[in-house]
A protein has these predicted regions:
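Transmembrane beta-strands of outer-membrane beta-barrel proteins
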Residues: 28-34, 72-74, 118-122, 166-168
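Short sequence motifs at beta-strands and strand-loop junctions characteristic
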Residues: 47-52, 92-99, 141-146, 185-189
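Gram-negative (and chloroplast) outer-membrane scaffold detector with strong preference
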Residues: 22, 58-133, 155-157, 188-201
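Surface-exposed strand-loop-strand hairpins of Gram-negative outer-membrane beta-barrel proteins
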Residues: 33-56, 142-143
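A charged, solvent-exposed segment within the mature domains of Sec-exported extracytoplasmic proteins
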Residues: 126-169
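Cleavable N-terminal export/targeting peptides
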Residues: 1-24
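Outer-membrane beta-barrel translocator domains and adjoining extracellular loop/strand segments
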Residues: 39-46, 81-88, 127-136, 175-182
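A broad helix-preferring feature
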Residues: 11-16, 26, 68-70, 146-148, ...
Length: 201
């Protein structure tokens, strides 16, 4: 009888531990850099931007010991310069970017290092800001559907905390803010390195 009780206890502990492992979650806060490459197109309109510094907040839910679902919210502010045959001096658009994406993350484990890769998608919200850094244009806010991919590594500081370093790529159509004058009809790969701290619970 004692052996059966012990066996039931061990199975229960194992099941609870397994479920705890499967339901492990984490949140992370990171600093990010958004690098938009210079784009030229068949419409003779080109577009480019300075490097933008911002932030990224992420939440991960572990489906398995290696696989997780991730939700992201990012925020940056930048200037995009458009040039074309009829506006050689260019139009400067001051932009606030917001990222809302989700991805599947696959983790590897090597001692305290946890490399990972991810892929997913979502949306970028482009908000044109009216201020002295913006050329006067009748522009509208725009949302583009994006693809997301990335790879990085997490270094475990403790069972609850790790440092996370990642390169992310965001595939998006170049925005025109509702103005056909700014059409490039091009997609580009936005580079987005991030570094931050994650808390596991």
């Amino acid at each position: 009888m004692k052996k059966i009780a012990l066996l039931v206890l061990l199975l229960t502990v194992g099941l609870v531990a397994g479920r705890a492992q499967e339901s492990r979650q984490d949140v992370s806060i990171s600093g990010s850099v958004l690098v938009e490459p210079w784009v030229t197109s068949t419409t003779d309109v080109s577009a480019g931007a300075k490097r933008a510094i911002g932030g990224l907040a992420s939440y991960r839910f572990m489906l398995t010991p290696r696989g997780a679902l991730e939700a992201n919210y990012g925020f940056e502010q930048n200037n995009i310069l458009y040039k074309g045959p009829t506006f050689l001096n260019g139009y400067k658009v001051n932009v606030r970017n917001q990222e809302i994406t989700a991805a599947y993350v696959y983790n590897f484990t090597f001692r305290k290092f946890n490399p990972f890769v991810e892929g997913g998608g979502g949306a970028l919200l482009w908000q044109s800001l009216r201020n002295e850094a913006t050329t006067t244009l009748d522009l509208k806010n725009q949302t583009t559907i994006v693809g997301l991919y990335g790879a990085g590594v997490a270094y475990e500081l403790s069972p609850s905390f790790d440092i996370r370093l990642e390169y992310r790529g965001i595939l998006s159509k170049v925005p025109n803010f509702g103005d056909t004058l700014l059409n490039t009809n091009k997609y580009y790969n936005i580079y987005n390195p991030v570094i931050g701290v994650a808390y596991h619970f």
